[in-house]
Every structure is written in C-alpha cells, then in structure tokens.
Amino acid sequence: MIEIRETSSGVSFAVRLQPKAKKTAIIGELNGALKLGVTDPPIDGRANEALIRFVAGLLKVTRSSVTIAAGESSRNKVIRIEGVTAEQVRFRLKVW
C-alpha cells in the first residue's frame, strides 16, 4: 500500500521512477512507493517534467500544484501535491 502523508497544504508520497519506459504509466507499488514509468530519458530534467505532467493529469490537478520535494536526481522521489487530501489521491489512484 502506498504511504500518503497529509501536509498542511496537501499531501506527499514516495515515487519510484523508471525513465525510458515503453509507455508512461503506473507500473505498481514498491516498498510503500508508487512505481511509475515515463518514456522520457533522465536528461536535462525531462523525466522529472514528464513525471509532474503525468501525476497532475492522473490526479486532475494543475501542473503547478505538483512538485518534487526530494530526489530531483534520483529514481526515488517524494512528490508534494497542493490542494488535495489523501482520500482524494487514494480514490483517483484506485480509479486508474
């Protein structure tokens, strides 16, 4: 199960990113983190930008409300999303 932490302005959760995947999609769950694949390579922040776009679309929030709180240059990241609750995130991840 993915660990989603409530913050004062939204939520945060761990992501394990797989750059250069065959398609941009949810791959599954790995050690409490959401495992995602993006087709972009990890060059010049392209994989990070693809991750932000994908998560924003998945959770139906603006791109500006999604930030990488930790792990800019790592496959293991912490994503922060403003303006949503943990319950909303869980619901939208189940629908996907």
From Swiss-Prot:
UniProt xrefs under SMART domains: DUF167
InterPro entries the UniProt entry points to: DUF167, YggU-like_sf
An example Gene Ontology CC term for this record: cytoplasm
Pfam family, one: DUF167
Family: Belongs to the UPF0235 family.
NCBIfam families, per the entry: DUF167 family protein
The protein's name in its UniProt record: UPF0235 protein Acid345_4205
